[in-house]
């Protein structure tokens, strides 16, 4: 299996960028990235070998690995000075560099996933960076998660430092998730310690993206960003600060989370979009790709969606997973990443590697 040319991609800021943002010089991957997602727990477990087998026997050519546990605690032992200062007493993955070496030995690439603005663990160490309610206690979304202020310089620097840590460990790409404001819960009760409440949320997220491009991308570290699937439709920031054309220039790849189960009833005429995986993704990508095509060529990132491989809204089958992959291919996507929170993927949906 050929290792995608992720580590070889250039992410150099150019001086001829349009006003208001910096553009990236991009080099296309040698082949589309086809990845599956692993939690820190799965990476540390005996099941890790089964994912290495996927790299050797199937079309999968990359593994996406969380750098943080679900609560935000670092899931590994840091090696760089800025992150060592935040090292936990215990960590889930005991031998992360060795795991990365094993991925490379199997012919795959390693992608580090960083959940940025949703992080309970960091908020406990730096309470001044967390969103709060009027009484001063941490604000929580509808699921109970704590969020950090997207306008906080310390929080943004932490993301930059983690990206540098990932590159030092040997990861080929850094994937940034939760680069947005909260979308649910008692939003009007949030007290922001840094955001002034008047700067548009899209501008706050844009400033984060610009910092990543400058402090991470220009150092030759390949980057990708996860965005709501509906960002390929919505013309505004959807109240969370994610606007397609605004974010596009700053990352090598955008990863819209086009899980059909996450679309509301009635989308594209479907009572239950989860039961129409090809159509939902086809229409989403077609719409977004047209918008991206209107940008200057140097501002167009690769599009590599997150696809659904879990049961929500419908019981997913091999054929339904495969249908999503076909929709990506039909719309010129640069591969895909499969999401299953417990790492149980439909192996029959993954084509065998050609000899």
Where do the PLM segments sit?
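Aromatic- and acidic-residue-enriched segments that line the glycan-binding/catalytic groove
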Residues: 75-87, 119-142, 182-196, 242
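Catalytic domains of carbohydrate-active enzymes, especially glycoside hydrolases
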Residues: 49-73, 167-173, 250-253, 328-336
